[in-house]
Amino acid sequence: MPVDAWIREEIEIPEGVEVTVEGNTVKVKGPKGELQRELKYPGVQIFTEDGKVVIYKEFPRKKDVAIVRTFKAHINNMIKGVTEGFKYRLKVVYSHFPMTVKVQGDEVVIENFLGEKNPRRAKILPGVTVKVKGSEIEVEGIDKEAVGQTAANIEQATRITKWDRRVFQDGIYIVEKAGKPIKF
């Protein structure tokens, strides 16, 4: 059963940002760069009118309402990315073995983690910059998903599975996600 006759979500386009919709592809261009994403779902229409992006669906069911609001969140994140960008902060923590972290090409290389001879590597996704400053790592970019996945790759590379986490707390941990501190 349809929830309503229609659902219409509108997003204001801020100054200095240009949004174009071609078919199912939404392109957002701003001062920090350009992002594009394919947003496709049967019956959902995306278009621009009067300085707004409109997402519209007739006779939506619950799932359709969720999809429309998901598309709205994706477009909002694209607009925020090209205007402000996204930044994750990670902290390098060690007590037993001093590890070194450095960026080589499109990888983060972690050496001497728990005294291991072979370095551990984490992939950096395209469009993301990683800076290592002592015991802090900054991951920045305009695509929220790429920045978040790169930070997760770095955190995952130093995951300990076989040892007691209460004793061996060495690793790299996300401490701030897109400007919001993480509570432990």
Curated annotation (Swiss-Prot):
PROSITE patterns: RIBOSOMAL_L6_2. InterPro entries: Ribosomal_uL6-like, Ribosomal_uL6-like_a/b-dom_sf, Ribosomal_uL6_a/b-dom, Ribosomal_uL6_arc, Ribosomal_uL6_CS2. One of its GO terms (biological process) is cytoplasmic translation. Keywords: Ribonucleoprotein, Ribosomal protein, RNA-binding, rRNA-binding. GO terms for cellular component: cytosolic large ribosomal subunit. Pfam families: Ribosomal_L6. Belongs to the universal ribosomal protein uL6 family. This protein binds to the 23S rRNA, and is important in its secondary structure. It is located near the subunit interface in the base of the L7/L12 stalk, and near the tRNA binding site of the peptidyltransferase center. This is Large ribosomal subunit protein uL6. It comes from Thermococcus kodakarensis (strain ATCC BAA-918 / JCM 12380 / KOD1).
